[in-house]
Amino acid sequence: MDFQQLADVAEKWCSSTPFELIAAEETERRMDFYADPGVSFYVLCPDNGCGDSFHVWSESEDCLPFLQLAQDYISSCGKKTLQEVLEKVFKSFRPLLGLPDADDDAFEEYSADVEEEEPEADHPQMGVSQQ
């Protein structure tokens, strides 16, 4: 995929997130993203003929630790698309953006269902005779 196509994918992704694509450097194959309150990162895109993968980084000391999840994902097996990488970065930054963690929402829904169940009574306990 050429760099302009990658930039188009990034723009489309930004339209559904708080992030803005603030710079796209074709010569460096680098895209810079920013969202309030001061959350920034950049993506280095692999060259077409190269087997390299995407690389994400932040020059902000506050943001860098949150990128570990995305960096681990990128370095895991298999080729990743820019869309997949950006989604993982967004998930990593949710706490910094003041958004609930996507996994926490699913867990809370599941917990709520469990809490609504009535405990079943009159079950004999194991090892206790019913005489």
UniProtKB/Swiss-Prot annotation:
Biased composition (Acidic residues): 107-120
Any Pfam family the entry gives: DUF4581
Annotated segments matching region Disordered: 107-131
Residues recorded with modification Phosphotyrosine: Y34
Protein name: Maturin
GO cellular component: cytoplasm
Lineage of producing organism: Eukaryota, Metazoa, Chordata, Craniata, Vertebrata
Taxonomic source organism: Rattus norvegicus
Family listed: Belongs to the MTURN family.
Name of the encoding gene: Mturn
Main function: Promotes megakaryocyte differentiation by enhancing ERK and JNK signaling as well as up-regulating RUNX1 and FLI1 expression. Represses NF-kappa-B transcriptional activity by inhibiting phosphorylation of RELA at 'Ser- 536'. May be involved in early neuronal development.
Cell compartments where the protein resides: Cytoplasm
PTM section of the record: Phosphorylation at Tyr-34 is essential for its ability to promote megakaryocyte differentiation.
BP terms from Gene Ontology: positive regulation of ERK1 and ERK2 cascade; positive regulation of JNK cascade; positive regulation of megakaryocyte differentiation; regulation of signaling
Keywords of the record: Cytoplasm, Developmental protein, Phosphoprotein
Main localisation: cytoplasm
InterPro entries registered for this protein in UniProt: Maturin (IPR027892)
Superkingdom in the source lineage: Eukaryota
